[in-house]
């Protein structure tokens, strides 16, 4: 009986350690998902705002990349370990020639496709 409890406890701990990884669906996610949020903010500046989310996550809003009337605005979902779970452009400029977007260029994600 004790061995069953120990085995079940082991399975429970193993499952508790599992997390769902966000699959990168764009160059920003490919470049930044799983990276330290501190590295992002050190390279590009502090966020505009932060909001507490579910499960210990924090939603940060960042804006920068001001060049010739263009800017980039993204939302970063950061876990309690201060790693980026997801990054999403909410204000971006598409390249009319089909190249990388303004946010992809500014946030070093143009080659992350």
Regions found by a protein language model. Give the residues of each.
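Bacterial N-terminal signal peptides that target proteins for export
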Residues: 1-8
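Residues within mature, well-folded domains
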Residues: 19-113
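C-terminal motif of bacterial Sec signal peptides marking the signal peptidase cleavage site
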Residues: 14-17
